[in-house]
């Protein structure tokens, strides 16, 4: 999968690329470094895009092939911003670019003399504010995910394997040109108590519950949905009571999502209501504050 930061800055999904943004006084320029197309790559992967394609399609000012990297003047840079400033990770990153030895040496030499600054937090702050088009992509991914969840709710039954449910979910997403946002958790019965259960190989049993944490990703924008459903198609009274506690907590947490609120503020709203509900259901004992503190 493409680096989210690289995709955010370029919109490009192709691998083995380097984006260099330079600023001299008030002037700045962008340079994309990519592999030179060759006949072997064409046989294995198809025709690679040309320089003009990247310039025109993605509005990149300059495009260099990796064997032309030393034509780019980097040795006067006082500060260099990387997605990571750790020396070992930087060296590993350069190695993963599959450059020739002279080009790798050139890049290492010209980065070693500069002050390295971690760019990731700056990019995270930028990415936190979504444009209308980004919100639209996320909504689309969420809609596909929701439909896939509804689909498996309808087809779920005793005797199926967890991986069959997962396959059904993936099939629906792929039919809508979506990938998986993360490895699916499809956990029936006690498996749902394992926070990151990924074996997905148990058999679904009547009167048990099935937890599905799975979601679609569309054009590198992800959704994230978790739902718990009755395998038999209907909750018993106890299951229904717990479900309603969780549903109400979710509704209250969503209402708490307002400007100025932090994630921990919203988390605490849900925790307080769930804890209160579990005490009333006699699953937890003791005072509300004490249970929350020990959570």
Feature locations, PLM:
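Active-site neighborhoods and metal-handling regions in enzymes and metal-associated proteins
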Residues: 1-295
């Amino acid at each position: 999968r493409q680096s989210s930061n690289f995709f955010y800055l370029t919109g490009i999904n192709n691998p083995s690329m380097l984006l260099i943004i330079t600023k001299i006084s008030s002037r700045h320029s962008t340079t994309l470094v990519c592999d030179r197309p060759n006949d072997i790559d064409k046989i294995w992967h198809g025709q690679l895009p040309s320089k003009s394609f990247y310039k025109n399609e993605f509005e990149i000012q300059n495009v260099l092939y990796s064997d032309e990297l030393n034509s780019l003047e980097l040795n006067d840079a006082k500060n260099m911003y990387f997605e990571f400033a750790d020396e070992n990770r930087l060296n590993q990153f350069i190695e993963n670019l599959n450059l020739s030895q002279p080009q790798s040496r050139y890049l290492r030499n010209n980065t070693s003399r500069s002050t390295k600054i971690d760019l990731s937090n700056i990019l995270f702050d930028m990415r936190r504010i979504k444009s209308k088009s980004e919100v639209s992509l996320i909504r689309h991914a969420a809609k596909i995910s929701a439909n896939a969840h509804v689909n498996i709710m309808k087809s779920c039954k005793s005797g199926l394997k967890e991986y069959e449910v997962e396959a059904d979910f993936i099939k629906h997403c792929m039919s809508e040109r979506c990938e998986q946002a993360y490895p699916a958790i499809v956990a029936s019965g006690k498996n749902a108590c394992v926070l990151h259960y990924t074996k997905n190989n148990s058999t679904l049993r009547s009167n048990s519950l099935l937890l599905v944490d799975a979601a679609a990703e569309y054009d590198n924008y992800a959704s994230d949905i978790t739902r718990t459903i009755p395998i038999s198609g209907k909750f018993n009274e106890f299951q229904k009571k717990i479900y309603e506690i969780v549903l109400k907590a979710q509704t209250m947490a969503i209402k708490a999502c307002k400007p100025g609120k932090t994630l921990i503020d919203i988390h605490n709203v849900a925790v307080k209501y769930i804890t209160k509900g579990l005490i009333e259901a006699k699953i937890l004992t003791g005072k509300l504050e004490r249970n929350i503190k020990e959570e």
